[in-house]
Amino acid sequence: MHLPREAFLLALAGAFIFPSSQQEKRTQRDLRVVCFYQKDFRNGTKAEQWGKKTPTQIWRGCMSVCNAIVVCLFELGVSETWNSKSCKCDCEGGESPTEFPSIRTGSSMVRGVDCMPECPYHRPLGFEAGSISPDQITCSNQDQYTAWFSSWLPSKARLNTQGFGCAWLSKFQDNTQWLQIDLIDAKVVSGILTQGRCDADEWITKYSLQYRTDEKLNWIYYKDQTGNNRVFYGNSDRSSSVQNLLRPPIVARYIRILPLGWHTRIALRLELLLCMNKCS
């Protein structure tokens, strides 16, 4: 089965540079480029948010920087399946390809070289440092966080926060609750660190993760190697931080943490990790 006609290539993550010479290609070898197919990018519409570049221009620019970290995300919709255990991009020779990769659902077949299975370096997104603003962090039933609960808003879900109101506390204790982060721009997310409430024995013991690149797209569950929704194991006390790395990393603007189990109450402090191509 061929790729749906509305599927086009976008490129994300940081400033996008189009080298104009072989020398520029060499000097831009540390540029991070993220390529992925997005089902909702419709029928030849220009990628307005990416500097008015067409999908083909973006593809060629991406592939011209061969030493970049390349991550691919295939979003084929709810009714279609992508059975490959990895995704691939043709960046072998440093030349722009003349066509998109050939992709067939259900066949695990993609032309090109393997994408990055794991990030070489990570850096905190900025929950603990405060660079993530309160309005970037939301939760289920947030309009009901009044009175005492107004001190335990989702914006309090910051790693190592101390004092009263030192975590996000869910007002309801069931599996329909979630905490959501808007990264403003799509980024390469490579891991998550979690803690419980600092002043009481309340924490999340396990959770799942959803993500998407646009609010108009369906949520995608992060899967394990068997194709099932991955269950991440969380905390066992109030203060220790537990790290879960994403292998492979994901391209996302929106991230949702969905608690599956908890001790006493759903309580969360966290930090997200971003994928870096070099230690900085």
Curated annotation (Swiss-Prot):
It is a peripheral membrane protein. The gene is xlrs1. The keyword Cell membrane applies. One of its GO terms (molecular function) is lipid binding. It comes from Takifugu rubripes (Japanese pufferfish). Residues 119-275 form the F5/8 type C domain. Disulfide bonds join C119-C275, C166-C198. Its main location: secreted. Gene3D superfamilies: Galactose-binding domain-like. Homooctamer of 4 homodimers; disulfide-linked. The homooctamer has a flat, cogwheel structure with a diameter of about 14 nm. Two stacked octamers can assemble to form a hexadecamer. This is Retinoschisin. Binds negatively charged membrane lipids, such as phosphatidylserine and phosphoinositides. May play a role in cell-cell adhesion processes in the retina, via homomeric interaction between octamers present on the surface of two neighboring cells. Required for normal structure and function of the retina. Keywords: Cell adhesion, Cell membrane, Disulfide bond, Lipid-binding, Membrane, Secreted, Sensory transduction, Signal, Vision.
